[in-house]
Regions:
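Peripheral docking tails and interdomain loops at the edges
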Residues: 2-83, 214-224, 229-243
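Active-site cofactor/cluster-binding pocket
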Residues: 1-8, 12, 16, 21, ...
Length: 243
């Protein structure tokens, strides 16, 4: 959109075409997505159709962000619709840049792709720091082709490789599907874990029957191998890919 323009180029082209064709009665709306490199999940796309069902939908809107300045953003549809192919397993891994989480998940994609008949898809998120920053790995695998060009928001398995994310209140367990698995790599006892988990996370775990596991890969890695290798084994085992 050019500064001072009434709309985006495509919106203006369509509006001009409709007007010249005498079709002014057609309701025309225009929206933006991908602003700030933000992901566009299915819940945002469903929000567009929900908006179009109104008698007077917004002429201009944005999706994928929360616009509290111009208030043009559409609220995402909740709960998020499930659009993945039936039988697809979705996993999400929260790591620390440089801890090997991304490398381990790339290895997992190779193992699953080379040694099973399953389809596999992987996306990786980094922040600007890269090393020492937050990384999120998104893995999908299943028996049917995977056509999900967006990040995972409702996972069967979520792993937190850095316990500081729990103490900082990162919303990780909220990405687990009801009945799914949430795993934390930490050195805490049960009492310490109960102290570090905030009330919102505890309520979500209880209300959605989340299976909570802890693994002390930190101490084990000192004795045996890297943290990422141990957690990679755990994630593959919990997904029933290891026999």
């Amino acid at each position: 959109k050019e500064p001072g323009a009434l709309g985006d180029p495509l919106y203006l082209d369509v509006a001009t075409t409709l007007r010249e064709a005498g079709l002014d009665t057609i309701v025309l709306t225009g929206g933006r997505y991908g602003l700030g490199s933000k992901d566009t999940p299915p819940s945002s796309l469903f929000a567009v159709y929900k908006e179009l069902e109104k008698d007077a939908p917004k002429a201009r809107f944005t999706i994928g962000i929360v616009d509290d300045v111009t208030n043009l953003s559409l609220p995402e549809v909740k709960p998020a619709p499930i659009t993945a192919a039936e039988g697809t397993v979705e996993c999400k891994f929260w790591g620390l840049g440089g801890d090997g989480t991304v490398g381990a998940n790339k290895n997992s994609t190779k193992i699953i792709g080379d040694h099973t008949d399953k389809y596999i898809q992987a996306y990786f998120q980094y922040d600007s720091k890269k090393t020492g920053g937050v990384t999120i790995s998104h893995l999908r695998f299943g028996d049917k082709p995977i056509r999900s060009p967006y990040y995972i928001n409702q996972a069967d398995f979520v792993a937190c490789h850095n316990p500081s994310y729990v103490t900082k209140g990162f919303k990780m367990v909220q990405d687990v599907k009801p009945g799914g698995v949430f795993m934390i790599n930490c050195q805490w006892s049960d009492e310490e874990l109960a102290h570090h988990l905030n009330a919102e996370a505890k309520k979500y775990i209880a209300d959605n029957n989340i299976q909570l596991y802890t693994i002390n890969a930190i101490d084990k890695a000192i004795e045996l191998v890297w943290v990422n290798v141990l957690i990679q084994f755990f994630s593959l085992h919990s997904s029933n890919l290891l026999t």
